[in-house]
Amino acid sequence: MATFIDFHALQTLPPSNINRGEDGAPKTAAFGGTRRQRISSQALKAAQRRDFAHMLNRDELGVRTKQIVAETAARVCAADPEVSPTEAEKWSSAAFGKAGIKVAKPKAKKDEEPKPEQAGYLVFLGNHQLDRLAAAIVEKRDQAFTKKEVLEIIDTEHAVDVSLFGRMIADDAALNVDAAVQTAHAIGVSEAAPDFDFYTAVDDFTKAEEETGAGMMGTIEMMSSTFYRYATLNVDQLLENLGSEEALVRAIDAYARTFILSLPTGYQNSFAAHTLPDLINVAVRKRPVSYVNAFEKAVAPDERGTIAAASEAMADEASKVTELYGLAPERSWLIASDALEADVDSLGQKTGFAELVSQLEEHVRAQITEDER
């Protein structure tokens, strides 16, 4: 049976707009009959991918681009300066064609130099996969690849971010990578209450007697919410994608850190909503369980505030899951302030941030050792 690691967080943001829709307003969703502020899963994952650059080495990460031919060709030329850019592009294009990834020349504007062939969609490949492909092209030069040879390079030992968040190749489903992480849209635990920031700016070189109005004015919509965030990580799927137990441990360590610490950055120059979670619960289970239904009824703040009421509701939901379905976690850790501890101590073993990451890593290593017996 598969092993899952569930990540739960309650996090309060002051007035802000870190994830907006096409109308510029903070994203929202209906839940429990009320409108809630929302942070999309795509925005959360994008922030996490950016943070990985500070936690993992370049060769452990991937790039997502249509320009796979130009990117590979550049690495071919870097590996062997005697290869011309034209040759490198031709050989790179042929290699991707063998793999079943279609590339074509993009339409050039008038008087614009022709560009290298591109994929018709974003392709997510590991840096080390592109480096290995470039090295193989340098070795084979104009000798044709077989499909098996190319797939052995670009469809094995995937990068950490590719392994976590998955990959879809429109031309060939066999090249898809099943995501090891499922990420929920973060939602506010209480009803959304939009507000507006009307701002003006004055032209520094306009004299007061010449103009009394503003040089520019506008409005930014903002909201403040306590969010419930949830994601689940399939340990077995991640191991299959990475192909290495050591890479698995490093990936889980990095993901735990980035889930806790990262957020989208929309309008942060205007709002500086750089908060950290008020509560973190990480649980190891045999099947994923979200506690979002704790907030199906919008939380009303009491004299202790919204976060205390939301924490109590989440702990009650976790207890209900255990009582009704017998789905108690194998291990569970909790990060919470002393003020919340009495309400949430049933969620797991209280610990600190560094200790949680370390103990989670130890648990995964022990689980691997046990599975190998």
Walk through the language-model features, giving the residues of each:
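Basic polyanion-binding and macromolecular-assembly surfaces
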Residues: M1-R38, Q42-R373
